[in-house]
């Protein structure tokens, strides 16, 4: 049976969000969450989790190109641990290198420069993170 999974693209000003099904391996973007220095409105996150009832969440890890961690990687991990602590949801991690670049390219190709809104880029990045996770975990 398939799982519902939500992915987050953590950022200090915006946290992208996407939802998908393991059975199809596809994701759709959801509205991004505004954040203040990486802290979202937890009530908004809770509302999203209650609406979609995910079996788990995937948090993108912004690694350096050589695979090492940076400050933002540690903050993304902290965000994931808080999701688990606050809502009891299982959290998995996914390398997100180059997803923002790929998301910008896809959005630009569809709608040009004006379509490149930060929240939209972050949520498309979350889709790419989730689809990558599905590819690496076909069993769900």
From Swiss-Prot:
**Which keywords does this chain's UniProt record carry?**
Cytoplasm, Hydrolase, Nuclease, Ribosome biogenesis
Which terms in the Gene Ontology molecular function aspect does this entry carry? nuclease activity
A GO cellular component annotated for this chain's UniProt record is: cytosol
Its EC number(s): 3.1.-.-
SMART domains per UniProt: YqgFc (SM00732)
User: One biological process GO term for this chain?
Assistant: rRNA 5'-end processing
Q: Where in the cell is it found?
A: Cytoplasm
Q: What is its main location?
A: cytoplasm
Q: Which InterPro entries match?
A: RNaseH-like_sf (IPR012337), YqgF (IPR005227), YqgF/RNaseH-like_dom (IPR006641), YqgF/RNaseH-like_dom_sf (IPR037027)
Which Pfam family would be a valid example here?
Answer: RuvX
**Residues forming coiled coils:** none
Function, as annotated, reads:
Could be a nuclease involved in processing of the 5'-end of pre-16S rRNA.
Q: Which family does it belong to?
A: Belongs to the YqgF nuclease family.
- Which HAMAP family is this protein grouped with? Nuclease_YqgF
Q: What is this protein called?
A: Putative pre-16S rRNA nuclease
């Amino acid at each position: 049976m398939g799982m519902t999974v939500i992915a987050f693209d953590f950022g200090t000003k915006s946290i992208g969000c996407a939802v998908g099904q393991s059975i199809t391996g596809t994701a759709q973007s959801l509205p991004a969450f505004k954040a203040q220095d990486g802290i979202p409105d937890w009530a908004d996150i809770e509302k999203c989790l209650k609406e979609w009832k995910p079996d788990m969440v995937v948090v993108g890890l912004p690694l350096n190109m050589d695979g090492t961690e940076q400050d933002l990687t540690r903050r993304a991990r902290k965000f994931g641990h808080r999701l688990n602590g606050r809502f009891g949801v299982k959290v998995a991690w996914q390398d997100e290198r180059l997803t923002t670049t790929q998301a910008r390219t896809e959005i630009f190709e569809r709608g040009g420069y004006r379509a490149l809104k930060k929240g939209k880029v972050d949520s498309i990045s979350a889709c790419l993170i989730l689809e990558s996770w599905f590819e690496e975990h076909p069993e769900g």
